């Protein structure tokens, strides 16, 4: 498990919500039927004072085992994109991580992660987002988050959605998933590193440093 976990939220309603989410077992049968046959393990990472919100896809197997979000190579890349060290990234009073599914969904026949079960976001997101009233910037990572929170603006797929990033500033930025499987995508789209990343880093620094 990561060494950067901060103390849990002390606000009673938030503490209760976090406990309820951590105890969620809605997908027990679904996960038992996967190749890994694993039990649910929701990775819960938010506090109400967070200013940066990351809505991502779902934990991978390594994150499932560590019980810490982005505790993998994807996290290394994401932290580089954001210009954040691990201590800042894992400070729940500054950064909230609310994936489309809080548990590792298992693998598909090709060895890739299964999609996040829609029941997870339907069940938990509204209540969680209601507590995050200090958020100044939301990052929508990957197609599932973008379709849910951008609606028709995300119909063209991840590339077109991310290419239109200027349309969503200053409160939101769509990003591709930082998986190393997307290295080819990054090579095909050099504008991402040249144009979007400098703005992303500046905006993240602004929202985390402004009192």
Where are these regions (language model features)?
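A polyanion-binding, active-site-adjacent surface
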Residues: 3-208
